[in-house]
Amino acid sequence: MATRTQARGAVVELLYAFESGNEEIKKIASSMLEEKKIKNNQLAFALSLFNGVLEKINEIDALIEPHLKDWDFKRLGSMEKAILRLGAYEIGFTPTQNPIIINECIELGKLYAEPNTPKFLNAILDSLSKKLAQKPLN
């Protein structure tokens, strides 16, 4: 049985495919997750994250951008965008504790991105979580 960490990793892969121009990924997300042995509760969890990010993608991007400092969101790599979007969605729109979300995103960065990406993800998501703690979205 898959873990939430594995489910998040699969969601990042789906978001990466979407960011890379594969809009058909929305139609086959469920079967792709099942191929990765993401089933039952974890399948529902992964699909809720994937669909949640896509439904709120513009709002999520607007949440992330002010925390980039010297970076332009459009110039970020597709994998970095995928991980940041997942993290920002979970921080802003789910009850999962922020330290858990940030740690999971750091681990995903180590697995999928460039060596300096985990520090970058940590800085952005930590800044975002502190901002939302002061002024929640709901």
Curated annotation (Swiss-Prot):
GO terms for biological process: DNA-templated transcription termination; transcription antitermination. Pfam families: NusB. The keyword RNA-binding applies. Keywords: RNA-binding, Transcription, Transcription antitermination, Transcription regulation. InterPro entries: NusB-like_sf, NusB_fam, NusB_RsmB_TIM44. GO terms for molecular function: RNA binding. Involved in transcription antitermination. Required for transcription of ribosomal RNA (rRNA) genes. Binds specifically to the boxA antiterminator sequence of the ribosomal RNA (rrn) operons. This is Transcription antitermination protein NusB. Belongs to the NusB family. Gene3D superfamilies: NusB-like (1.10.940.10). It comes from Helicobacter pylori (strain Shi470). GO terms for cellular component: cytosol.
